[in-house]
Amino acid sequence: MTYKRIDTSEYPQQLAQKADRVREMFRPFHLNEVEVFESPASHYRMRAEFRVWHEGDDLYYIMFNPETREKIRMNEFIPGSLLINELMKELISLLKPNDVLRRKLFQVDFLTTTTGEAIISLLYHRPLDDQWEQEAIQLREALTSIAKVEVIGRARKQKRVLYKESVTEEVKVDGKSYLSLQTENSFTQPNAIINQQMISWAKRHAGNNSHDLLELYCGNGNFTLPLAENFNRVLATEISKSSVAAARENAELNNIKNVTVVRMSAEEFSAALSGELESKRAADAEIHSFDCQTVLVDPPRAGLDKDTLKLVSQYQRIIYISCNPETLTENIHDLSSSHKVTAAAMFDQFPYTDHIETGVVLERKS
């Protein structure tokens, strides 16, 4: 929950500097071009977290200066969606006079969609009782004039969901819309516009195929479902139980029938595919029946481990989405004996920060 004050007029210059860094990063791989995808300069983040500061009768959101750790009062949040900013103001005005809802409240999390839905999570340093729930129900009703809002209370070893713990986002890719169930406290792409551009880029480079797609780290099916129409079948793996459930539900929601989602880590899948591990989940999914020639990976910051690198090196085409340039370049070097980079892109998922999201396509050398 750190925050540096931003000046939107500086965004074009910052984007250009970031793009230069990415071009330099890919220079050793002899690429002629790196596509750069620009974010909106403001109101691009669909989720945000704030600490709550109590000062007498006053109550307000804060974030911290990353260098000095100084508290910054947040009456608005320029990176946050317009809906986050609207809800911030209304919520704090409703919490201030409410002794039950404000007592030992220390954090508020917002998750919003482009379709006007939101989840507000209230985090406490105390157990939540029935009185809290009654007040929270009234709070939710008061906020419905702004958006379709769900309210969730969290405390140590406790979670109180009033009605639902998910919202439905509409992801628009190349003129087509996909519904995406997004669950509270599960990973979702923070920048909706950039996310749509990432999916579109991946679809373009995937091409239209008669074979199958393997996807590792599929999350809630963010890439899986739009790419399903590019392939005969899709075999997708994910370790998070809630994300697997969301991916399967999203496939049903969009009436996509050619996707199989398996709850396995990339390491487990690799071992099961090679025959080193007996797995009922792998057997039930009939993983050996798939004819995968393309693999899509969107790993955590640590990148791909040795076993997963060995696995992906067997495929004709690798589409690699990365949130860490260092581990990405290491992995590309590891794959350089079998594959070459044929396309690269920078997606400015996190404007005004040093964080860089990139995508590369690697093709097997002839």
From Swiss-Prot:
GO annotation, cellular component aspect: cytosol
Matches recorded under PROSITE patterns: SAM_MT_RNA_M5U (PS51687), TRMA_1 (PS01230), TRMA_2 (PS01231)
Catalytic-site annotation from UniProt: C323 (nucleophile), E357 (proton acceptor)
Molecular function (Gene Ontology), one example: tRNA binding
Any GO BP: tRNA methylation
E.C. numbers: 2.1.1.-, 2.1.1.35
SUPFAM superfamilies cross-referenced by the UniProt entry: S-adenosyl-L-methionine-dependent methyltransferases
Reactions mediated catalytically: uridine(54) in tRNA + S-adenosyl-L-methionine = 5-methyluridine(54) in tRNA + S-adenosyl-L-homocysteine + H(+); uridine(341) in tmRNA + S-adenosyl-L-methionine = 5-methyluridine(341) in tmRNA + S-adenosyl-L-homocysteine + H(+)
Keywords for the protein's UniProt record, in alphabetical order: Methyltransferase, S-adenosyl-L-methionine, Transferase, tRNA processing
InterPro entries assigned to the protein according to its UniProt record, in alphabetical order: MeTrfase_TrmA_AS, MeTrfase_TrmA_CS, SAM-dependent_MTases_sf, TrmA_MeTrfase, U5_MeTrfase_fam
Pfam families: tRNA_U5-meth_tr (PF05958)
Cell wall biogenesis/degradation as UniProt keyword: no
Residues that coordinate or bind S-adenosyl-L-methionine: Q189, Y217, N222, E238, D298
Family, similarity comment: Belongs to the class I-like SAM-binding methyltransferase superfamily. RNA M5U methyltransferase family. TrmA subfamily.
Classification via NCBIfam families: trmA_only
Task of the protein: Dual-specificity methyltransferase that catalyzes the formation of 5-methyluridine at position 54 (m5U54) in all tRNAs, and that of position 341 (m5U341) in tmRNA (transfer-mRNA).
Protein's recorded name: tRNA/tmRNA (uracil-C(5))-methyltransferase
Protein's gene: trmA
